[in-house]
């Protein structure tokens, strides 16, 4: 995780954009087999390795991909959707579109699933203009079928960014999706009902069932970053 932070910090210090920083940090996490994203994604119950990723910016752009095969860095494909007419692509269609844009196609070996371990990755970056970019990537929750869609590529569930605030979630995707967790935490802050920290605590404690593991990170255009979880979720913030 330190290497990913250093990569994003270097981009931002050099005057790069929030999108560039978030994507490149996410790529480093996808390339690390420790995490359930990209090269470290877990097998589905049929033995396949299917990858989801999303990217949203505070200026209203969005891209997400679902169930991609043979794509070690799905976040790069999501990033290429930011300026397209369409927002999201899935399955074979997503891979075909990635081929047309020159994205590398390579088998992802993946790894066996692990009980009780999530390891989805998320990055939120802010550049010198105050613009935000929120990137997430996953191989999906362990022991799920090939057709299953979790929270990561679903707007408002695994991520939400607009009006100077970005929120990203990780954990049990079904619970996150049912509660529309990222959007509702985001809305609670914007409505001035809570701070970043208290809104995340509210979201997990009030919207998520007891015993379900979930974590959140958030960042505003004019403040520090924050993280909160009801389980062991490593997170870090760099303030340049």
List where the protein language model places each region.
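Alpha/propeptide regions of enzymes that mature by internal proteolysis
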Residues: 1-240
